């Protein structure tokens, strides 16, 4: 199951209209790197959400370290320093296939292993919660009885069968080939 579906099911959703955009988010976003995989910290509302989640001092430190190391080709330190699942924030996509998703941010579930076990207990189907895209596949949690190893799960998800962009496939069934 995609982490984004679980974010919606658990209420880990932030609405743009419920957020107050602050000075630092407005100004720091101008200096954030932009990539082709989605909306990053160059979106002021997304940066404000990070500030709300981890605090301004940590975001300022992460921004400073990123600015100093970027000229040397070091990337990703902002997300590592901020921690707390900041890389798992998804949303505020102005090019989204869903109009509502343009003003929503989804945050990965806080306790994915427990959530996986609860879903398995209720549905009788072993599940793994993934935050996957065309660049990386992040296994957030799996139920205790999941029949595959972590390596087998990563292998099954390496080409991102749920797709990216407009493909919007929230559930993937993994079964043996033979």
Regions found by a protein language model. Give the residues of each.
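N-terminal and secondary-structure boundary signal
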Residues: 1-178
């Amino acid at each position: 199951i995609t982490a984004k579906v679980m974010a919606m099911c658990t209420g880990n959703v932030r609405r743009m209209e419920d957020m107050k955009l602050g000075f630092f988010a407005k100004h720091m976003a101008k200096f954030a790197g932009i990539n082709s995989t989605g909306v990053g910290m160059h979106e002021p509302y997304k940066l404000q959400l990070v500030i709300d989640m981890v605090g301004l001092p940590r975001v300022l430190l992460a921004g400073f370290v990123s600015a100093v190391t970027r000229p040397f080709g070091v990337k990703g330190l902002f997300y590592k320093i901020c921690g707390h699942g900041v890389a798992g924030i998804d949303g505020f996509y102005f090019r989204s296939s869903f109009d509502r998703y343009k003003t929503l941010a989804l945050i990965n579930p806080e306790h994915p292993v427990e959530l996986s076990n609860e879903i398995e207990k209720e549905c009788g189907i072993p599940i793994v919660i993934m935050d996957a895209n065309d660049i990386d596949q992040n296994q957030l949690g799996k139920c205790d009885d999941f029949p595959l190893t972590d390596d087998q799960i990563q292998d099954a998800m390496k080409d991102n069968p749920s797709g990216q962009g407009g493909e919007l496939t929230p559930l993937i069934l993994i079964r043996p080939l033979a």
